[in-house]
């Protein structure tokens, strides 16, 4: 099997795990920020043992790389917290659909970073995506849970777009496991104070679910995705990532009996169509 096909499989598997991970926001009754803390604790421990077993050097090449990876860890913590918050206040479908707008953010951020002009077509696609988001929102009152879910989901999508661009920059310098470890270890440090502020009570079932979320749906999936970026364009990875809400919504329907409304289905089709076209066009 050639390296590109292997990378495609890695990206597809990672996206499947990402999509299903959203269900943990409903399966766990803990606050979203505590779910993320548990997630990154288990995932960073798993990745550390993996790196030690593989005898990988985790020392970074330049001091400035530590600074950027700290930033990436902070962004990751914000991304996952808003992601689970979106799902907890609304539904898996709404949270995932709002988050899935991230490739549109990428099309705006990449030209800005590369100091290029934003194309008119990208602005049109952003408007179409926004219309899809509007369809998903049943009410424009900030007190509405679905509206809150969309807003949290959009923040999650925006921060994930930033993270994707930064990951692409450093995946050529370090192994996927090293990048994932630093990001998630930094997230642990950032989030640990919230444990003492909220003082959550854990049940055995919570710990088992957090371990599963941290090791399989975070450590392994995150590593697979970053590794796949070595031989796959960011735009191609974004196209594959469009399947994430599809996986999540299907599993939420079967396991949680969360059936999306007609508005959510229509809005989702508009969003995913715009996202798919924008990533195809940018190749």
What are these regions (language model features)?
Residues 19, 44-45, 130, 185-189, ...:
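Small-residue-rich packing faces within the transmembrane alpha-helices of Major Facilitator Superfamily
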Residues 48, 54-93, 99, 135, ...:
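Specific transmembrane alpha-helical segments of multi-pass solute transporters/efflux pumps
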């Amino acid at each position: 099997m050639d390296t590109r096909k292997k990378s495609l499989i890695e990206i597809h598997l990672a996206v499947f795990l990402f999509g299903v991970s959203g269900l943990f926001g409903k399966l766990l009754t803990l606050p979203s920020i505590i779910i993320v803390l548990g997630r990154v604790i288990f995932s960073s421990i798993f990745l550390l043992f993996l790196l030690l077993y593989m005898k990988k050097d985790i020392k970074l090449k330049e001091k400035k790389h530590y600074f950027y990876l700290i930033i990436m860890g902070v962004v990751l913590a914000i991304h996952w917290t808003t992601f689970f918050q979106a799902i907890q206040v609304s539904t898996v479908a709404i949270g995932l659909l709002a988050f899935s707008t991230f490739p549109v953010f990428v099309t705006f951020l990449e030209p800005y970073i590369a100091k290029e002009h934003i194309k008119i077509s990208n602005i049109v696609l952003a408007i179409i995506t926004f219309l899809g988001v509007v369809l998903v929102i049943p009410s424009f009152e900030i007190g509405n849970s679905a509206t809150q879910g969309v807003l949290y989901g959009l923040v999650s999508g925006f921060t994930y777009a930033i993270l994707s661009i930064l990951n692409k920059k450093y995946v050529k310098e370090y192994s996927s496991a090293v990048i994932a470890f630093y990001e998630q270890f930094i997230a642990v440090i950032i989030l640990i104070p919230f444990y003492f502020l909220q003082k959550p009570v854990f049940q055995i079932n919570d710990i088992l679910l957090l371990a599963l979320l941290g090791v399989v749906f975070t450590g392994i999936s995150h590593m697979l995705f970053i590794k796949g970026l070595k031989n796959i364009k960011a735009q191609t990875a974004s196209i594959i990532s469009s399947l994430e809400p599809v996986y999540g919504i299907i599993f939420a329907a079967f396991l949680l009996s969360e059936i999306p409304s007609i508005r959510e289905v229509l809005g989702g089709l508009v969003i995913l169509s715009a996202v798919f076209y924008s990533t195809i066009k940018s190749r």
